């Protein structure tokens, strides 16, 4: 196994070196492509918007076995591309093509909306088109000056909800005993193992934050589209009557409800964009540059020299767990080492910690918090930027900051802690399996799935 692992690592490193060599040769032997005048920036988001991409094995990427459904796009890349385009005279229009955007998240999209507004304020137009808009796709599309829909398309908005499966009866039938210890009456994470339904406390808490998210979602549409404050709710709650009125034509319903400005086939969209951009490429399509290529070109053009004074930026995205972890998971040891490096680096004068985490290991959270405490003790300011969520352990580490910044829809705070473990001694007893033995103390051998915990041990 060690030989196979070593061979795999060698192959990955060799492939990486070959790719880097090819890129260097290509850049040194050819001119960097330029962006033509009167070009549209195509914001074609493919995948989910994230603060940090999950780690994917390079060999898996190389042989093309990465799951397309797991594609991710950095929010900061979108923001940077739009900001560059705003001041670029070659870019005259921004086109939102969001059919392949899987998940946005209202908090992340709210960070993109201001840069889209700044793009419009510069006198440039934003046009959105799509076949069918999902809930997240439509919110981002609604930030455009003009929104178009395919004649066979529709706008699918459902609202926010939280529904869970509950296992109490199943566990009782299987005679599996779940020992749950929690602090905080609103800490409902383990309710599925303790109840057959959602508690009133959980319903109350969930309705509060879901209602806040929904208000932010709907107002972001109605204000931008100049609709009545209740327009989105009326669209959803009255969809049956609207479909009957328009003979099942979902696109016409969207137009009549003010959600889109019109319907266009794909060829009509292309012709319209040619008229707007004023340019056409050799294939007969409107002149456009994808935002990823554009961002790469602009970063090459505007590369900044290394300075002595820097602000460090570290992203903590995912569940907080112990040890070393890849990108997309907050490893206690991994993140604390990055913070320590920033503390020891004299050129780093301050640190911004971006947190998007619902928490996890209390121990790992404390390891991270301690490193942040040491960083501040060195006199380096710490600013926390919260993403969609910074809860429980995520808030524990954020509380160490000099300043904390969040979006209107960030879920943050901590409502308690819990611990849980199952025992199956009764289940095994039904099968004729028993456990017995001796130990040198009252605790010896009393940690596992097949033992019965005494009252004092549970305490």
Can you describe what each PLM-predicted range is?
Residues 1-243, 270, 274-459:
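Small-residue-centered hinge/linker elements
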Residues 244-250:
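Extended, domain-scale alpha-helical bundle/helix-rich regions
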Residues 261-264:
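A structural motif shared across PLP-dependent enzymes of the aminotransferase-like
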Residues 267:
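Extracellular glycan-binding segments that recognize GlcNAc-based cell-wall polysaccharides
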């Amino acid at each position: 196994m060690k030989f196979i692992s070593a061979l795999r690592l060698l192959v990955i490193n060799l492939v990486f070196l070959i790719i880097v060599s090819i890129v260097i040769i290509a850049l040194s032997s050819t001119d960097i492509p330029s962006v033509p005048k009167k070009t549209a920036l195509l914001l074609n988001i493919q995948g989910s918007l994230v603060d940090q991409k999950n780690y994917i094995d390079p060999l898996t990427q190389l042989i093309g076995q990465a799951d397309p459904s797991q594609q991710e796009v950095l929010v900061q890349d979108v923001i940077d591309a739009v900001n560059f385009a705003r001041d670029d005279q070659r870019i005259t229009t921004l086109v939102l093509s969001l059919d392949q955007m899987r998940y946005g998240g209202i908090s992340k999209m709210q960070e993109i909306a201001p840069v889209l507004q700044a793009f419009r304020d510069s006198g440039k137009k934003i046009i959105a088109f799509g076949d069918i808009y999902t809930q997240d796709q439509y919110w981002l599309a609604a930030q455009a000056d003009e929104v178009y829909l395919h004649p066979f398309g529709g706008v699918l908005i459902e609202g926010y909800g939280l529904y869970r499966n509950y296992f109490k009866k199943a566990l009782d039938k299987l005679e599996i005993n779940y020992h749950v210890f929690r602090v905080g009456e609103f800490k409902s994470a383990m309710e599925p193992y303790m109840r057959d339904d959602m508690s009133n406390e959980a319903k109350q808490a969930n309705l509060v934050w879901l209602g806040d998210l929904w208000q932010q979602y709907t107002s972001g549409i109605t204000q931008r589209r100049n609709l009545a404050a209740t327009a989105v709710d009326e669209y959803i709650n009255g969809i049956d009557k609207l479909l009957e009125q328009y003979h099942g034509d979902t696109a016409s319903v969207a137009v009549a409800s003010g959600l889109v400005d019109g319907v266009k086939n794909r060829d009509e969209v292309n012709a319209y964009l040619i008229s707007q951009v004023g340019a056409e490429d050799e294939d007969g399509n409107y002149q456009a540059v994808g935002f990823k290529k554009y961002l790469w070109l602009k970063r090459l053009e505007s590369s900044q020299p290394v300075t002595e004074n820097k602000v460090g930026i570290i992203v903590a995205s995912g569940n907080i767990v112990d040890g070393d972890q890849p990108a997309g998971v907050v490893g206690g040891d991994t993140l604390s080492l990055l913070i320590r490096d920033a503390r020891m680096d004299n050129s780093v004068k301050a640190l911004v910690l971006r947190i998007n985490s619902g928490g996890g290991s209390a121990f790992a959270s404390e390891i991270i918090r301690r490193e942040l405490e040491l960083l501040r003790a060195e006199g380096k300011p710490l600013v926390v930027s919260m993403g969609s969520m910074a809860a429980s352990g995520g808030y524990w580490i954020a509380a160490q900051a000099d300043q904390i910044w969040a979006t209107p829809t960030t879920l943050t705070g901590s409502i308690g802690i819990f611990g849980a473990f199952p025992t199956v001694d009764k289940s095994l007893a039904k099968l004729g399996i028993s456990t017995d033995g001796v130990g040198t103390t009252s605790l010896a051998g009393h940690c596992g799935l097949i033992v019965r915990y005494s009252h004092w041990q549970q305490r």
